[in-house]
Amino acid sequence: MSRSRSMYIWKLEPVLAAEGGVNKLIEKARRAKLSAIWVKVADGASPYRNVTGAMAATMTNLVTRAHDNNVQVWGWQVPHCPTTQAAQDEAETFRTLAQRFQLDGMIMDAEGGAEFFHGGINEARAYGTTMRQAADALQKSLGMSSNDIPQNITGWLPRFTEIARHADFNFPQTYYGSSPSVASRIDRAVNGNAHLTIPFAPVGAGYVGDGGGCASAQACAERATIFIQLCKDRDYPSYSFWHWAGAPMALWEVLNTTPA
C-alpha cells in the first residue's frame, strides 16, 4: 500500500467559501496529493453543521466529486458519552451519517479533558464496542485520533486505551509547533502509544498559533517537510495534518511539491 496523506476539515462552509466551491476544493486536494479529506460530521449524538440543513446536499456533492477524483472522504466525531446509553447513541449517530454520506472511513476523535469525553471506562467500552460493530457492518476503516501523549491527562489513559482497542488505526495528534523538534515530539508520542498494537499514523501541526501550532507560516512549512520525511523514514502507513482552514499557503506549497 502506498503511503497516504490526509487533511482534516473542521468547518466545511467557510473552507468552501475560501476555496470557491466543491470543485475547487477537490482540485486543491489533488494538487496537494491528498488521498483523503477528513470532515467533522458529528459532535456527541448531534450531526455537525457540515452535514445538516443545506450543507447536507453540499456534503453529498463533495463526496461524489471526491470519489470521481480518487480522493476519499472520512468522517470524524467528537464523542462525549456521559452515560453508556449516550455512548451507544453517539456511535449510532455516526453509523447513520457514515452510511448516508458514503464515507470511506470513520474516526473517533476521542480526547481527554472536561470539554471532550465525559464518561468513564464503561462508557469508553460502550462507545468503542458500538463503533466497532458499526464499522464492521458498513465495512469501513475505523480510526482513533486523540491526544498524542495520553498519559499527560489525568485519568485519561485507561479510557483512551479502551476506545483505541476497537480501532484499526491510531492517529495521534502530534502537534509539534512548540516542541524542541518534530522528531522529539513524535518520539514522545511513540512512547506514549507503545502499548497499542494498531498502526501509528501521526497528525502534523498544519496551522500557526497556540495549542501546538507553529510559530509562523514559514516554520509550519519547514516542520511539515521534516515531518513528511520522518514519516517516510519510519515507514508509517499514513499521516495527516490539522487542519485545512488553518494551513498557511507555505504549507500547501510543501504539499504540492512533495510526494506523499
How does the language model describe each region?
Residues 174-181, 189, 198-260:
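Substrate-binding cleft of secreted/luminal carbohydrate-active enzymes
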Residues 35-47, 93-124, 236-243:
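Active-site groove signature of glycoside hydrolases
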Residues 56, 132, 136, 140-142, ...:
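Glycoside hydrolase catalytic-domain groove-lining segments
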Residues 1-29, 34-35, 40, 77-79, ...:
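Boundary/entry segment of secreted carbohydrate-active catalytic domains
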Residues 1-19, 58-64, 72-101, 105, ...:
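Active-site-adjacent "subsite" loops/lids of carbohydrate-active enzymes
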Residues 7-13, 67, 71-86, 124-158, ...:
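Aromatic-lined carbohydrate-recognition surfaces of secreted/lumenal glycan-active proteins
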Residues 13-31, 84-100, 151-163, 182-185, ...:
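Short, acidic/polar
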Residues 2-8, 35-38, 70-74, 103-107, ...:
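Structural preference for beta-strand elements that scaffold enzyme active sites
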